[in-house]
């Protein structure tokens, strides 16, 4: 079992534009949070192996298994917002699943960005995110132009 998990996650790397954007946001004092669905041990291991743990406050990681609320239940998002001390209008949720990520976030009034890079085909396109991005370079540009963040180009 250990060998299986080691092999499964050994090749897990973030896309080349993820870490630079997260570092820029972190350096700018922007709170970076994660809302993820799955077993706590597996999701925590993914975050660790992706090398992102130094950029995310552990108190801003919300794993459905640990909280006891699954996506797409908006209560999972409400819990995250409350614990982070944010109103929905102060948050931008980036997700790759229109039904499980974007719809619940939008229902609460959060800003949303649908990442199409790893999105599975056949999603309910009647659900419309505020922004559609192909990669995190596009997300950075959106953060600069729409939300006025002073971020470097990468």
What residue ranges belong to the model's regions?
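Asp-based, Mg2+/Mn2+-dependent phosphohydrolase catalytic module
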Residues: 19, 23, 31, 35, ...
């Amino acid at each position: 079992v250990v060998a299986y998990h080691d092999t499964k996650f050994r090749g897990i790397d973030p896309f080349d534009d993820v870490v630079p954007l997260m570092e820029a946001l972190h350096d700018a004092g922007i709170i970076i949070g994660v809302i993820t669905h799955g077993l706590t041990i597996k999701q925590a291991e993914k975050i660790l192996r992706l090398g992102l743990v130094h950029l995310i406050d552990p108190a801003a990681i919300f794993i459905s298994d640990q909280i006891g609320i699954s996506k797409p239940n908006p209560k999972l998002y409400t819990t995250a917002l409350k614990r982070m001390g944010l109103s929905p209008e102060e948050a931008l949720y980036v997700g790759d699943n229109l039904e499980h990520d974007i719809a619940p976030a939008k229902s609460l009034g959060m800003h949303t960005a649908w990442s199409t890079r790893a999105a599975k085909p056949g999603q309910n396109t009647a659900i419309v995110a505020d922004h559609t991005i192909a990669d995190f370079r596009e997300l950075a540009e959106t953060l600069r132009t729409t939300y006025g963040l002073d971020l470097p180009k990468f």
